[in-house]
């Protein structure tokens, strides 16, 4: 059963198609949206407190019975979570898998995604939910702050995914997606240059140090939240620039068989910005050491 497409209004960049992405800070708060009613779940910790009060009021002696009640409540809460998950899976099987059985049967034999998506691990920004990717559409990598490490650095799961998707799956597009209020970017902006080297988070987000430096150079007078928003977008472009440092990626981009794109999802006002790397114009900027050029910028709102 084909889903009815959602229509968006698209406004195109009024500037030259090869101009650099305008990274100026935009308003954080957008229009109000209607609220969706959700089912209230009472946390297990609150239920335990209520149970304790009931025991005290009834005059019963706290002990093994009280402890057993707490364990039972925890188990019930855990069961509720997986019951919900089970129902979502069964709904998927009935409404999608069985309704498009031939497609899923073909996917069981092979995959041929058109996109490699590099997105943040943040639970609020699932690219499949936000952009409607279906199984088989996009090979997806998610890490803190949607960063691309330098080609020269050691092996990482992100670099392995790049190699596999580009050289084996032959994806036609790489889309790096950043987002508003990114905790990884906030950690990067707060981080001291000589931070705790034992921290996994520090050792990862330092990959985006160049974006932090460029943000501090042009936006140091702004409020910290606005600096972070600036860095969120700057980091996307620095990751796109890094991708061109992978020889086999740059070769395919040069041949025209692979395109690099940036995206920024603002979940505060539900807008999405998209742009594409202009490789020809970026080559000149690479020689100048001034970053990349972009084209085809649009805002979906």
From Swiss-Prot:
Main location: plastid
Modified residues (Phosphothreonine): 65
Entry GO CC: chloroplast
Modified residues (Phosphoserine): 128
Localization terms from the record: Plastid, Chloroplast
GO BP, one annotated term: carbon utilization
Free-text tissue specificity from the UniProt record: Strongly expressed in aerial tissues including leaves, stems, flowers and siliques.
Catalysis: reaction(s): hydrogencarbonate + H(+) = CO2 + H2O
Annotated Pfam families: Pro_CA (PF00484)
Domain of life, per lineage: Eukaryota
Transit peptide residues according to the UniProt entry: 1-56
EC number per UniProt: 4.2.1.1
Protein name: Beta carbonic anhydrase 5, chloroplastic
Organism in which the protein naturally occurs: Arabidopsis thaliana
Gene name of the encoded protein: BCA5
